[in-house]
Amino acid sequence: MSKTKLKEVIEELKNNKIACAHLSYSTRQNLPYVIWSTDEVECTCADGSIAYKEETIALEVYYNKNDTKTTDKVEEILNATCGTYDTSGEIYIEDEGVCEVIYYFASA
């Protein structure tokens, strides 16, 4: 992953003040490493009342999943932005022969 891409990710994380996130990657190399974040967004309804909705943002980071240096860096960014994260669960998705492991991170 290029340094420019990493800078964009850091900027995106800071801008969105992400509350929680999880990371996912494909078991095949060089497929997207994705940071998904869910944040609560305030909206004003037509009648003037305030409502809140959940918004999910996906930030794509391309790199070889065996590149542990980048993995550590992405996790460091998440920890710095969102506080400490613990893996709270995993889910396995099979789609067109690609097995994906999704790790859910919840604020400790």
What are these regions (language model features)?
Residues 1, 65-66:
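Residues that cap or flank secondary-structure elements
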Residues 1-49:
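Small/polar-rich, solvent-exposed N-terminal microdomains that initiate assembly or binding
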Residues 8, 12, 69, 73-77:
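Long, highly charged amphipathic alpha-helices
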Residues 29, 50-54, 96-98:
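Short coil/turn motifs at beta-sheet boundaries
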Residues 44, 68-69:
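Short active-site-adjacent helix-start/loop capping segments
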Residues 45-48, 59-63, 83-87:
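Glycine-rich loops and low-complexity Gly/Arg-rich segments
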Residues 53-65, 99-108:
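Oligomerization/assembly interface segments of phage tail-like spikes and tubes
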Residues 72-108:
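Acidic-leaning, charged glycine-interspersed low-complexity segments
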